[in-house]
From Swiss-Prot:
It comes from Chlorobium phaeobacteroides (strain DSM 266 / SMG 266 / 2430). The keyword rRNA processing does not apply. Allows the formation of correctly charged Asn-tRNA(Asn) or Gln-tRNA(Gln) through the transamidation of misacylated Asp-tRNA(Asn) or Glu-tRNA(Gln) in organisms which lack either or both of asparaginyl-tRNA or glutaminyl-tRNA synthetases. The reaction takes place in the presence of glutamine and ATP through an activated phospho-Asp-tRNA(Asn) or phospho-Glu-tRNA(Gln). Gene3D superfamilies: 1.10.10.410, GatB domain, N-terminal subdomain. This is Aspartyl/glutamyl-tRNA(Asn/Gln) amidotransferase subunit B.
Amino acid sequence: MKYELVVGLEVHCQLNTNSKAFCGCSALFGKPANTNVCPVCLALPGALPVLNRRVVEDAVKIGLATGCSVASHSILARKNYFYPDLPKGYQISQYEEPICSEGMIRIDVGEGQRDIRLIRIHIEEDAGKSIHDIGEDTYIDVNRSGVPLLEIVSYPDMRTAKEASAYLQKVRQIVKYLGISDGNMEEGSLRCDANVSIRPYGSEEYGTRTEIKNMNSFKNVEKAIEFEANRHSEIIDAGGAIVQETRLWDADKGETRSMRGKEFAHDYRYFPDPDLVPVLVDDDMLERMRLELPEFPEDRAARFVSEFAIPAYDAAVLTVDREVADYFEETVRVSGDAKVASNWVMGEVMRTLKEKYLDIAEFGISSLRLGELIRLIGAGTISNTIAKQVFEIMMSDEAAAEVIVTREGLAQVSDFGAIDMVLQEVLDANPGQLADYRAGKTKLFGFFVGQCMARMKGKGNPAIVNDLLQKKLAG
């Protein structure tokens, strides 16, 4: 494409607080429609909001994590607009004085890294939800109204759709590491609007932008941005002009469609909410939140490399998700073997999670049990092949690995006499292959090992099998 793509993202992160932003109603997802509602949610006369302290603390945490300037004094404002799922007629947000500003998020792109600047992070409450798939009518569920959000607004620093996706994934990783959100895009815990424009390469002036909504996965974010960039290019090449508007992404059709003309800030008539006092963040809160920050992925990966002597690639994979990193570290503590633990978590564990669509918290084998299984391998009680059989049994059996090995008769055979006898049977049964091996076809060594292991049902000690076989074949 002869144009440069320019993208900025507005990410809405739903906080995992127990109660809503300005009242005591439950903020839990999935409750029956219109059951988590009170006079404050609906702004009924006389109902006064009170800011949830946890919302401020979470905002400070992500501000510190992204290098933002955290304001000691910020203002909650009313964002006025009319929509069926906004019963109050306004949304409590922040405008002129946000709680966090001027931060940065570093993303990995290809061979290097890029820093994406943040304009602001501000507190906001969510709106309700319109439901269009029940008969011919539209229904309103206001359970979500008042659920706390943090809006993370970037500068238009992204130049490809992949960079935008990488940025969004990094935001998700940060909020999950902080423990302030589950980052679930399918449930709407993490939503993003993309501001997209194009300009000729070398130009410093921004083109007219469109805002894209309704993207519920990282892949859809990429597809929507790429489609919109191509649409802009085609319009400009045909001599047309881009209309500044909000567009919806239709994942089924793979295209965007016009939703409404793009609003400007003055259209919302922001003004300080007269029912809410300013948000004050003192030095004590800043220091307390700083002490609560976790070890972030980059630092944790570096520690894994130095402390456990595992490859940098393994460390990077294991620290993408905080819960997986915790699981791995506990497995190492129990097993005493970081490299084997790394192989198992990156291999069997992650494969199972992917196949069964599970999070690590839902996984049926605890880090303690996996560590005990790895310890049996290290002790020579079972081979790695048998360990995989035990692993599959452990998925549906809560017994310890050692109990399963004993019960199923899976202990490794290390008796030299027993292994020697089986090897002799294999050689006697395959005289042709034996002659070929001794004639120079040494690749048949693996054939003999396989035959021996098959006769011993995988329980032969591999080191002893290999050693004895080499001696027999040389005789």
